[in-house]
Regions:
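Conserved alpha/beta-domain cores
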Residues: 1-121
Length: 123
């Protein structure tokens, strides 16, 4: 759970998230071509702990979406949010919410990081 993972990895190596978002948005374009209209992807940025992290990553997602929109001449609808899975994210949720269109709660990870235990350990 700790270290160079989640959104921090995406900030250091944006090409990873650019590739994933490009694939999501091209799949959405294909769905629209097939007249499947009810799909709105929810792109969840992992392991966010600060407002800056989600802002950087959301800006990346929006930039990639615009690139795909321009290339395919297709309007894309999507949401960007995060999972509250770190104690700091829970404490800073008000700030993080300025950039998140949805939240999910990672109760297993949140419990593990709050108590400093591994999931392999039985209490």
């Amino acid at each position: 759970m700790l270290g160079h993972r989640g959104c921090r990895l995406g900030i250091s190596f944006p090409e990873i998230y650019e590739m994933q978002c490009t694939a999501i948005f091209h799949a959405l374009v294909e769905c629209k071509k097939l007249k499947i209209k009810s799909i709105i992807p929810e792109i969840m940025i992992p392991l966010v702990s600060t407002e800056a992290e989600i802002k950087i990553m959301k800006d990346l997602v929006i930039r990639v979406a615009k690139e795909v929109e321009n290339k395919t001449k297709t309007k894309l609808n999507f949401l960007v949010g995060t999972m509250i899975e770190l104690p700091r994210a829970a404490i800073k949720a008000d700030d993080i919410s300025r950039h998140a269109e949805f939240f999910s709660f990672g109760t297993n990870d949140l419990t593990q990081t709050t108590f400093g235990i591994l999931s392999l350990i039985h209490i």
